[in-house]
Amino acid sequence: MSEQPTFEDKLQQLESIVSQLEKGDRPLETALADFQTGVGLVKDLQKTLKDAEDTLAKVIDNDDELSDLELTND
């Protein structure tokens, strides 16, 4: 059974893709495939961050501390 990549693994992969795309020396088809992979990684990373944010808000709310915690979606 294969381990799921961690948040950090996905972020590192995204950084690598961005670096390769910035060089501009990849064939169009490869660049498009890399871009699609990058978009998928961004969505996964955003979901992970949102889930973590929601969990923190619940923990804080359950402890009756900062119950008016505002979450931002920047």
Curated annotation (Swiss-Prot):
UniProt keywords, alphabetically: Cytoplasm, Exonuclease, Hydrolase, Nuclease
Claim: rRNA-binding is one of the keywords in the record: no
InterPro entries noted in UniProt: Exonuc_VII_S, Exonuc_VII_ssu_sf
Reactions this protein catalyses: Exonucleolytic cleavage in either 5'- to 3'- or 3'- to 5'-direction to yield nucleoside 5'-phosphates
GO terms, molecular function: exodeoxyribonuclease VII activity
Biological process terms in GO annotation: DNA catabolic process
Enzyme Commission (EC) number: 3.1.11.6
Superkingdom assignment: Bacteria
Pfam families attached to this UniProt entry: Exonuc_VII_S
Localization terms from the record: Cytoplasm
GO cellular component: cytosol; exodeoxyribonuclease VII complex
Complexes and interactors: Heterooligomer composed of large and small subunits.
PANTHER family for this protein: EXODEOXYRIBONUCLEASE 7 SMALL SUBUNIT (PTHR34137:SF1)
Protein family according to the UniProt entry: Belongs to the XseB family.
HAMAP family the record matches: Exonuc_7_S
Function: Bidirectionally degrades single-stranded DNA into large acid-insoluble oligonucleotides, which are then degraded further into small acid-soluble oligonucleotides.
NCBIfam families xref list: PRK00977.1-2, xseB
Protein name: Exodeoxyribonuclease 7 small subunit
Top-level taxonomy: Bacteria, Bacillati, Bacillota, Bacilli, Lactobacillales
Gene name of the record: xseB
